[in-house]
Structure formats: structure tokens, C-alpha cells
């Protein structure tokens, strides 16, 4: 409880779920404390656009303090959570010490799951955090600059990219890198031929987009091929080295870049809570998103295994799921503080979607309706613009997207190095 007698709501994590919870608590008669190891919120669905120069860092990363600056009942701390004691209702932090709580919103997200693949943690480029995307952007530019200085590197696969994962993250990333290569880079580096810079998408399963209808999978495959992406299904990665990728089939792909978009697992802190975890290190929750046995604890976002009441399926780790679950937690706590009865969580499906490149996208709604092409890309843009936290961010994204579409010029195409 806060020093003034108000209940304290502790929000762990400043992602979609944490920020969504804080926004719904803005007018609650409570002290709201949001803690994240970073001082910024990351818009994860657009990280691949940062990595390929379609958007600037400021369009993907947003100051948490700025986002919540109008919340008079909210404070933000930059700190790393060490432990959570569910019985004592207390969280421990290295930087700010212990914090007790009356309500806890556990939204610490996930981390990349390499599935034990040898060499992947050391050599792969994940696509889950702002530093991940910035590091990949600099690496891609550096490889082309290195090959421009020393063309013999091309034969070693310096410009080749392997993208792992046939879901939305992998497909969007592969399509964006292929367009970057076939468009801007081949123009800027005239000594490189298209066949010298290959983009390969590998998926361990028998097909891309297993959650989509066959016609959408076929469309995605054709759109990737049209952009120069080689698609390999039934191709599991055995190991990763700095300059090559070995598949379990025995095939070796020469490549200095491997982007990992193959899966996530819940934040490792959950393993210390003494809970029975579900697949992918995720925490099972009740219909109201509270932790069974702990009605004051809400688990939300990528770390939560939320069963959809309509389909009885566990909801995917998507930005829309994280945001809606966080908003539900914040709204429920605000109701409880005011003496009102909260409602069960009901997910409003925005569709599963991916954009593959300029004018190419796929959308599948919960009821089975599908879209492809420019219409699907417009729907994709509308959904993602709605997820952006401020109108300023939405306007900036539209300007950057429009500039790339009409001029084929990208905004983020320099590397900043130490003098």
C-alpha cells in the first residue's frame, strides 16, 4: 500500500501489456508503479522495418515517461526485477530495492527460444528487442560495405541472409530484406549481382503460415519468390556458425547473417515462482487473467497462456493480444479499487496478418474471411497504426511508409560508429 493509504498497483514490464494496463489505470484511486529494465516502450511488430531502414528508431521506441507523463498517479522506474514473492506480495529489484504491492500486473514478456540449436545464441540475430533490430541493421550495412571493399567476401556468402521461421515475423523480415537488397542495395553497390546476395527463408514444418488457409500460404510463397526469396520448408536448422548455417538434412547454406524468427518462450523469471508452466514457459491464467490462487496477480502479454473463450485455443503471442490483456488487467483493477465487479477477459480478434513487401500482404480473420494484396496491406497498416501509442507516432509512421512507397528511399541507411 502507498504511504497515503491508496492501494499500490505494481506493473512489471513496459511493453504492450504493461503500458495498456497503465493507461486504463490513469484515473484510478491508486498509486501505479511501472518498472521496466529499459526506459522505453518497444513497438515490436515493426522491428523488422527498423532493421531494414523503413522506419527510424524513434518510430519504434518510445520513452515510457513521455507516454505516461499525464498520469498523475503513475511513476516509472528503470530497474531489473530479481524476484517476486507471491506470498508476501513483494518484488525485489537491484536498483531500487523491494516494492510491495496490493495488485500486481506481471507483463515481463518473453525471450527468444532457440530450441537448443547449437551456435544460435551466439551467432543468430533475433528480432524481439530494439537493440536486436538496430544491431541487424548495422550488420547488414557493414556486410555490404565490407564486400564493396573486398569482393572476395561475396564468394564466402557475406551478403547472403538466412531467415528462420515461417510465421509472420520470419516472412515479414525475409520479404523486407529481399526488397532492401533488390532495390536500394543493388543500386548503391553496382558491383554486386543479384545472385551474389541471396535471401533464404527456412521453416522446419511442412509449410509456411500453418495457421493460414492454403490459398494464403500459396500467395505468401509466390510473393516471396517474386521478391527473390528462396523458400525451404521441412528444413530444420542443426547449427549456426558465423559464416554458414547447417540444416539437419545435411545441407549447408553459406551466409554471414542468420535472422531468428522461430519462436519465443516466457520470461525466465517465471521459473522461480513455483508455478506449473505451460508450453513455452508461459503461465496459465483464469478467465479474468488472474493467477489461480492469487486473485491480486494478473499475468498478461507474451508470458501468459490465455485461453480464448470462443475458440478454447491458447491465444498467440501477438501485440494485439498483449495490449488487450494489459488493458483488461488495468480496467479490472480500477473496477476493484472502486468497489465494482470486473468482467472476464474477451479477446477482440483483429485478424492474423503479415505484410510481405510493397503491395503484398495476407490477412485472415477469425470468422474465416481473407484478404490479399493492397487491400490486405491497408488492413495491416490500419491495425498496426492503431497499436502505436500516440498520434505523433502514427503520423510519423505514415510519412515514412509513404516516402518509402513513392520514392523507394529508406530513412535509416547509415551506421554510427565510434570515432
Q: What role is predicted for each listed range?
A:
Residues 136-194:
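Rossmann-like NAD(P)H-binding beta-loop-alpha module
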Residues 122-151, 243-246, 252-324:
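FAD-site-proximal beta/loop scaffold in flavoenzymes
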Residues 2-78, 82, 168-212, 259:
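Beta1-alpha1 glycine-rich phosphate/pyrophosphate-binding loop at the start
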Residues 325-419:
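C-terminal, flexible cofactor-proximal segment of oxidoreductases
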Residues 12, 100-111, 237, 245, ...:
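Short hydrophobic core segments
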Residues 72-87, 178-287, 291-293, 342:
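A Rossmann-like FAD-binding core segment of flavoenzymes
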Residues 1-6, 74-162, 259:
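FAD-binding core/adjacent interface of flavoenzyme oxidoreductases
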Amino acid at each position: 500500500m502507498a504511504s497515503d493509504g491508496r492501494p499500490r498497483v505494481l506493473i512489471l514490464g513496459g511493453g504492450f501489456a504493461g503500458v495498456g494496463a497503465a493507461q486504463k489505470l490513469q484515473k484510478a484511486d491508486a498509486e501505479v508503479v511501472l518498472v521496466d529494465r529499459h526506459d522505453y516502450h518497444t513497438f515490436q511488430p515493426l522491428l523488422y522495418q527498423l532493421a531494414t531502414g523503413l522506419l527510424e528508431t524513434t518510430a519504434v521506441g518510445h520513452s515510457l515517461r513521455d507516454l505516461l507523463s499525464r498520469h498523475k498517479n503513475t511513476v516509472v522506474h528503470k530497474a531489473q526485477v530479481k524476484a517476486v514473492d507471491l506470498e508476501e506480495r513483494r518484488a525485489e529489484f537491484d536498483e531500487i530495492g523491494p516494492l510491495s504491492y496490493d495488485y500486481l500486473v506481471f507483463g515481463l514478456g518473453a525471450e527468444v527460444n532457440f530450441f537448443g540449436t547449437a551456435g544460435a545464441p551466439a551467432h543468430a540475430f533475433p528480432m524481439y528487442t530494439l537493440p536486436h533490430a538496430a544491431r541487424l541493421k548495422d550488420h547488414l550495412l557493414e556486410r555490404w560495405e565490407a564486400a564493396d571493399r573486398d569482393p572476395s567476401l561475396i564468394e564466402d556468402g557475406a551478403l547472403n541472409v538466412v531467415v528462420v521461421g515461417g510465421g509472420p515475423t520470419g516472412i515479414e523480415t525475409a520479404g523486407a530484406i529481399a526488397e532492401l537488397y533488390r532495390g536500394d542495395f543493388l543500386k548503391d553497390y553496382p558491383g554486386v549481382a543479384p545472385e551474389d546476395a541471396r535471401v533464404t527463408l527456412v521453416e522446419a514444418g511442412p509449410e509456411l503460415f500453418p495457421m493460414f488457409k492454403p490459398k494464403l500460404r500459396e500467395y505468401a510463397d509466390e510473393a516471396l519468390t517474386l521478391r527473390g526469396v528462396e523458400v525451404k520448408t521441412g528444413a530444420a536448422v542443426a547449427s549456426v556458425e558465423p559464416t554458414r548455417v547447417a540444416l539437419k538434412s545435411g545441407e549447408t547454406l553459406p551466409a554471414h547473417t542468420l535472422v531468428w524468427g522461430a519462436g519465443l518462450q516466457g520470461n525466465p523469471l517465471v521459473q522461480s515462482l513455483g508455478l506449473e508452466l505451460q508450453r513455452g514457459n508461459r503461465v496459465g491464467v483464469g478467465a479474468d487473467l488472474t493467477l489461480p490462487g492469487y486473485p491480486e496477480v494478473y499475468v498478461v502479454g507474451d508470458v501468459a497462456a490465455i485461453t480464448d473463450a470462443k475458440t478454447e485455443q491458447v491465444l498467440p503471442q501477438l501485440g494485439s493480444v498483449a495490449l488487450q490483456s494489459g488493458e483488461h488487467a488495468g480496467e479490472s483493477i480500477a473496477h476493484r479499487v472502486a468497489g465494482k465487479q470486473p468482467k472476464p477477459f474477451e479477446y477482440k480478434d483483429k485478424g492474423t496478418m503479415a505484410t510481405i513487401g510493397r503491395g503484398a500482404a495476407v490477412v485472415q480473420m477469425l470468422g474465416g474471411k481473407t484478404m490479399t494484396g493492397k487491400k490486405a496491406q491497408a488492413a495491416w497498416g490500419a491495425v498496426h497504426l492503431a497499436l502505436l501509442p500516440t498520434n505523433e507516432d502514427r503520423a510519423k509512421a505514415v510519412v515514412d511508409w509513404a516516402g518509402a512507397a513513392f520514392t523507394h528511399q529508406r530513412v535509416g541507411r547509415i551506421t554510427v560508429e565510434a570515432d
